[in-house]
C-alpha cells in the first residue's frame, strides 16, 4: 500500500496498528457480555491508540541513524510526508533522496544537514499536534466508556496514560 498523503497514512496506520489494539481489546472483552456500543467504543479507542503509538514510533525512527531509520528506508511516515510536502529548496536534499535522485551513501554523508532539516522543519511538532488530536479523541471515548473500576483505569494506564504528559 503506497502512502502518498496524510489521509493515506492515517487510514493505513489505523488498519495496521489499530488492528493490533482491536485484537488486544477483543481478547479482553470476548468472554464478557458487552453491548454493541461498548464494543464500537473499544474499537474506536483502539484505532486512536494505534495512531498514538505509531506516530510516536515514526517520530523516534526518523531521528535515529541506524538500520531502523525511517528516512534511510524511505518510509512515508507522518513526519516524512510533512517534509515531502514543503515546497522550499531548504528541504530539497530530503525530497531528492525520496525521489531517488541521490543515493543512500550520499545521504549518509549529509547526516548533520538532514538532522538540521528535520529539527527546523516543524515535522516533529506537526506530528505531536496530530498525536495530540488522537489523544483528545481517545480521552473523549475513554470518558464515555462504561467499564468497571479499577480495570478501566488500568487499561488507560497501560495503553496511553504516559502520552498525556508529552509536551
List each model region and its residues.
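All-alpha prenyltransferase/terpene-synthase fold signal
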Residues: 1-167
